[in-house]
Design a protein with these regions (language model features):
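Catalytic PLP-binding core of fold-type I/II PLP enzymes
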Residues: 1-27
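Active-site PLP attachment segment
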Residues: 22-69
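Amphipathic alpha-helix from the class-I
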Residues: 62-79, 172
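Conserved C-terminal alpha-helix-loop-beta "cap" of PLP-dependent enzymes
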Residues: 109-164
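PLP-dependent enzyme catalytic core of the Aspartate aminotransferase-like
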Residues: 148-198
Length: 198
């Protein structure tokens, strides 16, 4: 049907691709709520000149374009994960634990937890030192909710709030790694002491 419409008009065809994708569409959009249960926008524009029609997309198309460009330029560093693990274990001793066997995870990603603090407390304070960590779920962090994924693995709500993730994007010398790890350990211990006073 869209092919026939294309033959009779120069209008841009905007289609909902949640259930069916038609190659004759100029623009497709998704109903993420129906697909995932979460309410957000999903729009893909196929021709760059369509970006001028921002009102159609509430600028989501520009965001998607920028994300695509960022992904094209994305780089990962796979040689420093094991060093980070050992340095973190040395600095944090019994206060660090792992939800998964890190040898079975992506070589540029490290997932761990620190006892008796919420990950968001450490995320905020380390950002001041330009050390960016995440709990892996931006939407949950924004709502101050614990990780749904960790809970699905069988951990309780309190434990799931401890989840921390690092992604390695550049080569670091051992001294740089030690500096980052020491900062993480220092900030963690400060937060832990402050929490004990509450």
């Amino acid at each position: 049907p869209l092919e026939k419409i294309k033959e009779s008009t120069n209008a841009k065809i905007i289609s909902n691709a949640s259930a069916h994708f038609d190659k004759n569409s100029d623009v497709i959009y998704f109903d993420p709520y129906k697909l995932t249960g979460y309410s957000f926008h999903g729009l893909i524009l196929f021709n760059e000149d369509l970006f001028e029609e921002q009102a159609i997309s509430n600028k989501d198309g520009i965001a998607l374009f920028n994300i695509l460009e960022a992904l094209k330029n994305q780089r990962f560093e796979i040689s420093i994960k094991d060093i980070f693990i050992e340095k973190l274990k040395d600095a944090l001793k019994e206060d660090i634990y792992f939800f998964v066997n890190n040898s079975q995870t992506l070589p540029y990603s490290l997932h761990f937890a620190l006892k008796n603090i919420k990950a968001r407390e450490l995320i905020r304070t380390l950002a001041l030192d330009e050390i960016c960590i995440t709990n892996g779920e931006g939407c949950s962090l924004g709502l101050s909710r614990p990780s749904r994924i960790i809970q699905a693995m069988g951990y309780d709500e309190t434990t799931s709030r401890n989840s921390i993730s690092l992604t390695f994007t550049q080569k670091l010398e051992e001294k740089e790694i030690e500096k980052i790890v020491n900062t993480i350990a220092k900030k963690y211990k400060q937060i832990k002491v402050l929490n004990q006073g509450n």
